[in-house]
């Protein structure tokens, strides 16, 4: 059995330390107040049994709480007082030096919490450690100085989650849609160097990757680009190649048809080269965040401005999917699934029906998804229904990174605008805690819910105020050179924070457990569903109320909870104990999702969750868990057709693994060993994570650096929907 120290390091449970701590308190009380040896042993053994029953590594603080409770149960109140006083004195000492232990533990790779915090960061790498060191300082400043103490305490208690506190000390925003079109067409500046409009497709791709890296180093969230913005440069290259061919074949008896054939062949090679640049640059670049850029590539045919551009865009999309299907080579030279870029493919009338013009691209996308987990799918049809601007027009556009969606916006010229906009940040409410705090009383639930929402509102205002007054100079690539704006040097970014240009997100998590506790049923049950929808509606109403009062675009957001699921679960267990079906797991359910272990088919799940996506305008994604579908692409195509007609944004989860020890490329299994969940090759028994390639959908993005115990349990509990 293991425990987690305050520094984050994971060590073996040692009952002798509990006994020694009790005896220290026992030694300074009078004889009449002392505990007997049998009582001390009983307390220590009870704590050990409690820790064993939790099926996870307990923290030192949780164990000390158990010791206090045990001393109280023995009616040794004077001993308890001494024990509590000692804890308090030690906590005061720690406050005088708030970050040293955590920083030292992560440098020495002893910090298990950090190791499993982000499934796309490797904390043993020096550059990642530097980011984590800066993050510890930022979190310390945030907790002690920058943030309202009530919000800090609520964050620590798991009542809410103040996202990305490790970046809050700086004036940084969350995620965005990069205006690549503006930067490529009008030029940009990177590291003080002016970059003019590119003269070929491959150069445009190279510049795009440099922009991606610069943007990623200037923010903490994901970013998205559209292949549509690269499509015009295909024809630029076509014309350039055509001129070269004419010069090469001047005076030769070569037909125009043959010349055009040669032009298109060379053009295809350039497209291959350009797309390869994006794929390999993205997975090999290291940003100042200590990781590859969290980048999403949007593939939307109807975004093209004319038929020629659409045809050229189709060529780029085909090559992007083809290369992703192939994968990238790991250190053993084996083709594996990369985490990035995340790919999103838009389903539309031109590509979703058999016989449609670009149906072949959708079939290729389905083949890729079955092997590599991407692309994910946006339905143009449903998005047109959900995202209606003030002109009454439906809009289709990419999320910012994983799932965060902008709300519809019309600029001063009356045109809808999405690229160049961003999200200010996220604060997530723990819906399960609201329900448990109410004790199941509906009236109390709504009162507590409103109080907690206002606390989240205060936390969101803190995020907004942290950005307010920020000069454009803090990130020229974003604010001055086109990614998000063309502001003057020294000009504050304030005008971009209001009027709907940017959004700010009220996240929510654990709707399933919340509804289950309040109604006794899953929210998929017809008797419980109205309550679930009313919870969603209340968050929408509050966001609209705040938006109207402040001219800031608040919107509900289905939080992915990558590692926070474990934090929330532990906090709930500490506050309310183990409640069957509610707090008996080391995770809580993401956003509005159906519980991972619930028996439901793919089509019913997607149809059910579509109602909740509509009520989550700030961000949402649904998934279905499927077996290996590489030999059943017809079923994948059926699912894609269903997605197009029924839900705005969805993905298919499968497995893509490889054992470097024995070459096994089937599913790497999750097993339990000494109370801890491990990944194990079923063929050779390898459990060395450094020699396993495991790709799983964590929460929208693909994770490849493994997960904490809570998220790992959630992955293990997932049932198939097909």
How does the language model describe each region?
Residues 232, 504-517, 537, 697:
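Contiguous, well-ordered alpha-helical segments that form the cores/surfaces of helical PPI scaffolds
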Residues 1-107, 716-721:
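Charged, amphipathic alpha-helical regulatory modules used
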Residues 23, 457, 461, 512-516:
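Amphipathic, well-packed alpha-helical segments that form the structural scaffold of globular domains
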Residues 89-500, 521, 525-687, 693:
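Conserved catalytic cores of very large enzyme subunits
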Residues 5-10, 29-36, 53, 410, ...:
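A ubiquitous short alpha-helical element
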Residues 271-275, 279, 516-517, 711-717:
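Metallocofactor- and cofactor-centric catalytic cores in central/energy metabolism, strongly enriched
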Residues 685-722:
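Long insertion/accessory domains within large nucleic-acid-processing enzymes
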């Amino acid at each position: 059995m293991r425990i987690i120290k305050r520094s984050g390091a994971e060590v073996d449970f040692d009952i002798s330390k509990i006994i020694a701590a009790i005896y220290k308190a026992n030694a300074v009380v009078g004889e009449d107040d002392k505990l007997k040896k049998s009582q001390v042993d009983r307390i220590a053994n009870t704590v050990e049994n409690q820790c064993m029953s939790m099926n996870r590594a307990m923290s030192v603080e949780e164990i000390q709480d158990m010791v206090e409770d045990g001393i109280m149960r023995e009616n040794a109140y004077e001993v308890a007082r001494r024990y509590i006083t000692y804890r308090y004195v030690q906590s005061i000492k720690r406050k005088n030096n708030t970050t040293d232990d955590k920083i030292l533990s992560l440098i020495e790779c002893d910090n298990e919490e950090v190791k499993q915090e982000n499934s796309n960061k490797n904390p043993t790498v020096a550059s990642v450690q530097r980011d984590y060191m800066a993050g510890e300082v930022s979190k310390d400043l945030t907790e002690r100085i920058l943030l309202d103490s009530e919000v800090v305490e609520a964050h620590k208690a798991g009542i809410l989650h103040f996202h990305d506190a490790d970046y809050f000390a700086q004036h940084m925003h969350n995620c965005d849609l990069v205006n690549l079109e503006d930067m490529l067409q009008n030029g940009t500046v990177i590291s003080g160097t002016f970059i003019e409009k590119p003269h070929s497709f491959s150069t445009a791709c190279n510049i795009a990757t440099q922009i991606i890296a610069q943007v990623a180093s200037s923010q903490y969230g994901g970013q998205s680009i559209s292949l549509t913005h690269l499509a015009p440069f295909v024809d630029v290259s076509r014309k350039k190649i055509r001129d070269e061919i004419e010069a090469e074949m001047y005076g030769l008896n070569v037909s125009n048809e043959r010349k055009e054939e040669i032009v298109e062949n060379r053009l295809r090679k350039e497209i291959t080269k350009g797309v390869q640049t994006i794929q390999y640059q993205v997975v090999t670049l290291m940003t100042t965040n200590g990781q590859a850029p969290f980048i999403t590539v949007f593939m939307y045919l109807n975004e093209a401005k004319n038929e020629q551009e659409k045809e050229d865009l189709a060529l780029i999309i085909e090559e992007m999917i083809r290369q992703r299907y192939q994968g990238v080579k790991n250190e053993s030279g084996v083709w594996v699934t990369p985490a990035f870029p995340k790919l999103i493919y838009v389903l539309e009338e031109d590509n979703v029906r058999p016989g449609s013009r670009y149906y072949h691209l959708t079939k290729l996308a389905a083949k890729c998804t079955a092997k590599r987990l991407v692309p994910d799918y946006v339905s143009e049809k449903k998005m047109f229904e959900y995202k209606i601007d003030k002109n009454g027009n439906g809009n289709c556009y990419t999320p910012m990174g994983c799932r965060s969606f902008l709300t519809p916006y019309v600029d001063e010229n009356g045109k809808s605008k999405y690229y160049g906009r961003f999200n200010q940040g996220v604060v997530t409410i723990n819906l399960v805690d609201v329900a448990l705090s109410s004790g199941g009383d509906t009236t109390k639930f709504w009162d507590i819910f409103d109080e907690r929402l206002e606390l989240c509102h205060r936390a969101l205002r803190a995020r907004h105020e942290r950005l307010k007054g920020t000069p454009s100079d803090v990130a020229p690539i974003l604010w001055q050179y086109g990614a998000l704006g063309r502001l003057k040097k020294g000009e504050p970014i304030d005008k971009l924070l209001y009027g709907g240009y940017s959004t700010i997100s009220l996240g929510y998590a654990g709707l399933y457990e919340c509804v289950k506790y309040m109604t006794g049923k899953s929210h998929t049950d017809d008797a419980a569903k109205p309550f679930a929808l009313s919870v969603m509606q209340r968050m929408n109403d509050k966001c609209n109320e705040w938006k109207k009062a402040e001219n800031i675009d608040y919107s509900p957001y289905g939080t992915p909870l990558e590692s926070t699921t474990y934090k929330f679960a532990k906090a709930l267990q500490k506050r309310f104990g183990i409640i069957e079906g509610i707090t008996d797991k080391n995770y809580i359910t993401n956003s509005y999702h159906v519980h991972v272990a619930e028996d439901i088919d793919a089509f019913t799940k997607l149809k059910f969750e579509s109602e909740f996506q509509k009520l989550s305008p700030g961000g949402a994604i649904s998934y279905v868990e499927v077996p290996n579908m590489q030999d059943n692409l017809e079923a994948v195509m059926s699912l894609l057709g269903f997605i197009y007609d029924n839900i705005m944004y969805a993905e298919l989860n499968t497995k893509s693994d490889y054992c470097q020890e024995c070459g096994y490329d089937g599913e790497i299994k999750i097993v339990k060993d000494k109370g801890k969940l491990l990944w194990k090759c079923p063929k050779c028994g390898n459990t060395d994570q450094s020699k396993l390639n495991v790709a799983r959908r964590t929460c929208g993005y693909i994770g490849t650096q493994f997960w904490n115990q809570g998220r790992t349990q959630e992955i293990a509990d997932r049932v198939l929907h097909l």
